[in-house]
């Protein structure tokens, strides 16, 4: 997989030379530390939307690391947000679904809080429905932004044959077996169960490619109404010009109409245009998308820098990367 990123890395280095250095990218989203290099202010983005357009974001609260996490504090946040289980818990800093969990009860919550005891944790309403990744961009000189890409995130399901255990279904599935270690752990309590013929078992509840979700190019779903709605939501975050929203909607038709949108995450600089992972898209198509994405990133960042936005030092950038790599204590 790392081989795929070699041409991209070379392309980024060329752009960095042309635009005055790689750290210029830190000016791309003034609302986020280092422009969202490690997406270290997810709560800030979601709470900004929640303040202006509460109907468009999953209810979100924050458990701060300096206050030892406990079930009592979690209960306070849930009461304030009028939430009940299931809920989503996830680190305020992280990528690719790292640490994101669907929590069904207080026992699971206590286990999670123990694992991530020294981490700022997002407490979020669980939203059912179809999940999409919508990549948004806006040049600072332009009054309106645009949707760069849309990805439909499909969650793999096992279909029972009436004779095989769930474990065997996972191991013999052409896609799921690549994620067998993760899926077997997630479903450890029912691996010996034999699903009835035709019964479907959902394997994952989180829209992350590295956790088994299938990404489908959904750019055909873009409409002027949807684009205008995403632009409106984005402007609720002062200083947000570039990144991917992960959102859920009740249906594909609702997405096209810009209705029932619930933002569950707003990512920054290192967002991927995840439509490139659609198996139907060629390698050449993927590179075209990613090259254009990074060209626009440098272009937007340069405009922000010219407008006086701060550029992070290399020390600050390296510190953020190290903090992400350390993970939970």
Locate predicted features.
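ATP-dependent carboxylate/phosphate-activation module, predominantly the ATP-grasp catalytic core
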Residues: 137-236, 267, 274-297
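A transmembrane-helix-recognition feature enriched in membrane-embedded lipid enzymes
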Residues: 1-30
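A short acidic, glycine-rich active-site loop
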Residues: 34-37
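C-terminal active-site "lid" helix and adjoining low-complexity regulatory extension at the edge
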Residues: 250-329
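Coil-to-beta-strand transition motifs
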Residues: 129-131, 140-147, 239-242, 255-261, ...
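Active-site nucleotide/adenylate-binding loops and adjacent lid/helix of ATP-dependent enzymes
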Residues: 31, 41-183, 223-227
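A short glycine-rich, hydrophobically flanked beta-strand micro-motif that places a catalytic Asp/Glu
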Residues: 125, 133-135, 240-254
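Short, flexible, glycine-rich and Lys/Arg-enriched loop motifs at helix boundaries
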Residues: 23-32, 63-69, 75, 255-256, ...
